[in-house]
Regions:
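Alpha/beta-hydrolase active-site loop
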Residues: 121-146
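Alpha/beta-hydrolase-fold enzymes
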Residues: 145-150, 161-305
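Cleavable N-terminal signal peptides of Sec/SRP-targeted secreted and luminal proteins
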Residues: 2-19
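Glycine-rich nucleophile elbow surrounding the catalytic serine of serine-hydrolase chemistry
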Residues: 134, 138, 152, 156-166
Length: 388
């Protein structure tokens, strides 16, 4: 149990957090606060998960459409967090795009199912395979039907790139609905991942069902109001714990203090972690162990039932025939250059190989880097315009 002294510290921290101006945690509220119009839409997948999308509508009807899809433990909030003139969603909106931001099952905005409450284990019985097979296609279909467009452009970060490739592997008919796909920090092959956390734990947790046995197939890194308020206060730029908060980010994606604005830390804590399943994390650990881009490994007992073989089949990258543009960093601990280039060499329509011209560019710089516009977003916009 916590002693009186510890309780006092926690209450003091929470009191300070609640007394000051709290960072906005809701994506739609943030967009309005930044001076943009916003719409909230929902779609139900064919397996009954209810997903929420955020849209920054265009000023003119018939504008070209872009879908932004987040990484693991993230949400639509990441695309607007850095504010006007810096965040990708606003940059694309200012350029005349109809901007839609998806949310995968299990995150802050998509914790809903037609039949299952989130406290049932079965709700969390999915990996990013299901996000690619069900969530992304449902999101695309809804957007195209709502806007009357036949195609859209896709931008994904991290797991948002993974699920795009899964969709194309398993549902190649969606190639016809994509003008171009821009993959930031593309996560497919991950055998050379440098993240010390992954390298330490993946050999154990990446064994079939190992992590599920240890943790339970439930939410990975669940958050609540208490944790959020505590994180916001501890991660303020003036906090003595600010460096600890920054190091948490660096340990995941690579050290790059030049691209991290400490003033952004408390805003990151207001929106992240946004929710994911244990199996999503386990699936990435399996990718590191196997050095393959393949389906979820249930074990030699269940795999024959699921796949008709003892090992899970590889995803069919040859099916990703819509133009794919790769953007990656030399200091990305999650997506190593050699892994990205293996992906590049297997894509049938690789339209751009873009190594960010900043030596220390890390995995999370794609969404939170202070110079993301200069080094990445300007190039993304230029390439997108070439497909209109």
């Amino acid at each position: 149990m916590m002693g009186a002294f510890q309780v006092g510290i926690v209450l003091t921290i929470l009191g300070l957090a609640l007394a000051g101006e709290r960072p906005i945690s809701d994506c739609a509220e943030r967009i309005v606060d930044d001076g943009y119009a916003v719409e909230t839409h929902q779609v139900t997948t064919t397996d009954n998960y209810i997903l929420t999308m955020h849209r920054i509508p265009p000023k003119e009807s018939g504008a070209p459409v872009v879908l932004l899809f987040h990484g693991m433990l993230s949400s639509s909030s990441d695309w607007v967090l850095m504010g006007p003139g810096k965040a990708l969603a606003y940059i694309l909106s200012d350029a005349g795009y109809d901007v839609w931001m998806g949310n995968a099952r299990g995150n802050t905005y998509s914790k809903a199912h037609k039949y299952w409450p989130t406290y049932w284990q079965i709700f969390w019985n999915f990996s990013w395979n299901e996000i690619g097979i069900y969530d992304v296609p449902a999101t695309i279909d809804y957007i195209l039907e709502h806007t009357g467009q036949k195609q859209l452009q896709y931008v994904g970060h991290s797991q948002g790139t993974t699920v795009y490739l899964v969709m194309m592997s398993e549902k190649p008919e969606y190639n016809d609905k994509i003008k171009s796909a821009h993959l930031l920090g593309p996560a497919a092959y991950m055998g050379n991942m440098k993240s010390p956390l992954t390298r330490a734990f993946a050999p154990i947790l990446g064994q079939p069902n190992a992590m599920v046995e240890l943790v339970g197939s439930m939410e990975f890194m669940p958050s609540n109001q208490f944790k959020q308020d505590l994180g916001i206060e501890m991660c303020q730029a003036t906090s003595p714990y600010a460096d600890m908060c920054a190091n948490e980010i660096f340990l995941i994606g690579g050290y790059d203090s030049e691209q991290l604005d400490y003033e952004l830390l408390e805003h990151i804590k207001a929106t992240s972690p946004a929710g994911a399943s244990v199996n999503q994390n386990l699936h990435f650990c399996q990718e590191f162990n196997s050095k393959k881009f393949r389906k979820f490994d249930y074990s030699v007992i269940r795999n024959p039932y699921e796949y008709g073989s003892y090992t899970p089949p590889n995803y069919k990258l040859k099916n990703a025939k819509a133009p794919v543009l790769l953007y990656y960093g030399a200091n990305d601990w999650m997506c190593d250059i050699s892994d990205v280039r293996q992906l590049r060499d297997e894509l049938p329509n690789m339209a751009l190989d873009y190594l960010v011209p900043f030596e220390k560019w890390a995995h999370l710089d794609f969404i939170w880097g202070t110079e993301a516009k200069k080094y990445v977003y300007d190039e993304v916009l230029k390439q997108m315009l070439s497909y209109e």
